[in-house]
């Protein structure tokens, strides 16, 4: 059909796709995935939630974006409340690399009065060295009629949810997508009707989920996660109309050890808070400082060695395109399998089988 052909060829004025589809197509070696790339020429590429670009592939991602701008004459627009540092020297170790050569510029002027005008929340930081356990946290959350609490792991979400009053809603990737969407729809309806609603969630609500709570609790994590969580609080500015601000409480969960990139982000934020009272963390300067510290803690920005595969044999014009295409996987799903879940229509289909 014409619509299917346009989807495969990106032969339309506006194309909506995912980061995975976009970047994996740019590094693909099969004709079926490459035939659409010429349509990127002279286009505007809008990357929503740019902070979600995977750090482990940041080097090849920024390289290909630079090529799109320089050779394809494309314009790249990053949209995010927490813009990472994509230009200059990124990282400090042997994996450090030079980011975008073309400077990233704001499309609007940034002034202190603009930040003041958009101030919608008040951040409350935990006292240094203090922690809270699940029981204490559940008691505190139960004191609110409408509250969102975001924790770092599915296990933490489950443990906290078990201690909450009846009627509390739970969100995590332990649920199938259909169930998640149904719960999000229910949350939005309850908020719209001004009904009591308490939600325990993992960070899946921090990007692309348009919900607005007067109070948000967030387990300690990286600054980008804290700010994204704050974006679910007084999102529409309704409290400002009555002279109030949304309340965001950051807490240290007892006996929690953050690993991987989440742990590196938390370490970078702790370093900033050691010399700051946390009142100016929404500023671009503080965000740049955070990402500089975060990247300095990272071990790799090209875990599949895509640069080596494509440039090692440059002098002999020997490029390992097929291997690079195989290894450039933003989501490693080679060992994954699809399953039919007995939820919603899935239950009916299982009965028919």
Regions found by a protein language model. Give the residues of each.
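SF2 helicase catalytic motif II
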Residues: 19-23, 31-71
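Loop/turn-to-beta-strand initiation segments
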Residues: 11-15, 20, 41-44, 71-77, ...
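Conserved H-loop
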Residues: 74, 81-84, 152, 203
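Interdomain hinge/linker at the junction between the two RecA-like core domains of SF2 helicases
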Residues: 82-142
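C-terminal helicase lobe and adjacent C-terminal extensions/tails of nucleic-acid helicase motors
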Residues: 69, 135-144, 150, 155, ...
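Inter-Walker segment of RecA-like/P-loop motor cores
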Residues: 1-27
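SF2 helicase motor core recognition
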Residues: 25, 157-158, 197-213, 228-236
